[in-house]
């Protein structure tokens, strides 16, 4: 049996959400709350998901570049004269995409929540 590539990589619940656009949605969500940078986003996602969705730099930074190229976020170097943290803010198009992705993912999130609650209730109920 092979070992998964990382937390959530082959998890049927988290893996499905990843494919459906959960990471872009989370980045856009946090960017809508205020300026953010890559490491901050990775920490917030890890905290929010209690480690179920671990994001590494090899995933985060290409995603940030792609979202910026699509005009969904705008990046600005903290110190333009030298390479430092790049802070991102959401654009109007990014807000619209966040709303679209949230509406698209809502049924999947509700289904997963219901499944987990059903499993918990079944396993924790008296025999």
What are the residue ranges of the model-derived segments?
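Short, hydrophobic-biased segments on the C-terminal half of alpha helices
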Residues: 61-65
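Beta-hairpin "wing" of winged helix-turn-helix
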Residues: 68-84, 89
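Short, Lys/Arg-enriched N-terminal segment that forms or immediately precedes the first helix
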Residues: 1-16
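Basic, amphipathic "hinge/linker" alpha-helix immediately C-terminal to the N-terminal HTH DNA-binding motif
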Residues: 82-102
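Amphipathic alpha-helical dimerization/coiled-coil segments
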Residues: 96-127
């Amino acid at each position: 049996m092979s070992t998964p590539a990382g937390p959530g990589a082959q998890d049927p619940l988290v893996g499905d959400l990843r494919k459906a656009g959960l990471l872009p949605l989370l980045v856009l969500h946090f960017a809508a709350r205020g300026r953010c940078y890559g490491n901050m986003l990775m920490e917030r996602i890890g905290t929010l998901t209690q480690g179920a969705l671990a994001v590494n730099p090899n995933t985060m930074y290409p995603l940030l570049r792609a979202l910026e190229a699509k005009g969904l976020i705008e990046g600005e170097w903290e110190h333009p004269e030298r390479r430092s943290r790049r802070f991102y803010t959401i654009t109007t198009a990014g807000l619209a995409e966040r709303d679209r992705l949230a509406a698209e993912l809502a049924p999947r999130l509700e289904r997963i929540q219901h499944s987990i609650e059903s499993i918990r209730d079944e396993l924790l109920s008296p025999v």
